[in-house]
Amino acid sequence: MYKTNIVFNVLALALFSIFFASCTDMKDESDRGAHSERGALWFGPRLGKRSMKPSTEDNRQTFLRLLEAADALKFYYDQLPYERQADEPETKVTKKIIFTPKLGRSVAKPQTHESLEFIPRLGRRLSEDMPATPADQEMYQPDPEEMESRTRYFSPRLGRTMSFSPRLGRELSYDYPTKYRVARSVNKTMDN
């Protein structure tokens, strides 16, 4: 008797789940999907999820069409003039590989430094007698006079020197123009 009761309960549960799975018109009219009172329990379609649609044509037909298109593409490629066709890749190594320590530079090529116009910051140009790249000793050895003056007055942040440079492209200029131009406001505001 106990076994028949368990079988009956399992059967009733299966019928109940099949009934509710197949019944789609039981949706309440006031139910608005994710915006309902039970929004977290909405099991509607997920946005952006692709549905698995059964393919309408056989995969063999698709594969045959793809092969046919590739054959047509090769036919038209062979019709091109020889200059426009890509060369076939070489299968054998015919050149001796020369070791180059840095990209783009070979060992046999003499290194010459061309004088390029280098602008380190906007609005600033280097003078002709100043080299474009200073030597390492000049870069990493601070000026002794500058070090003494810095320690005497204040200690700026790391990497800062006492020579202050204003905003990029600007020089400190305290020459004010002699004539000023005064214009009226466009939006008709009045000063009281």
Swiss-Prot record:
Leucine amide carried by residues: 47, 103, 122, 158, 168
Main location class: secreted
CC terms in the record's Gene Ontology section: extracellular region
Secretion signal, residue range per the UniProt entry: 1-23
Stretches assigned to coiled coil: none
GO MF terms, alphabetically ordered: myostimulatory hormone activity; neuropeptide hormone activity
Subcellular location: Secreted
Keywords for this protein: Amidation, Cleavage on pair of basic residues, Hormone, Neuropeptide, Secreted, Signal
Distribution of this protein across tissues and organs: Expression is restricted to the subesophageal ganglion.
BP GO terms, sorted: neuropeptide signaling pathway; pheromone biosynthetic process
Role of this protein: A hormone that controls sex pheromone production in females and pheromone responsiveness in male. Also mediates visceral muscle contractile activity (myotropic activity). Identical to MRCH which is implicated in the formation of both melanin in the cuticle and ommochrome in the epidermis of armyworm species.
Protein name: PBAN-type neuropeptides
Source organism of this protein record: Bombyx mori
Species classification: Eukaryota, Metazoa, Ecdysozoa, Arthropoda, Hexapoda
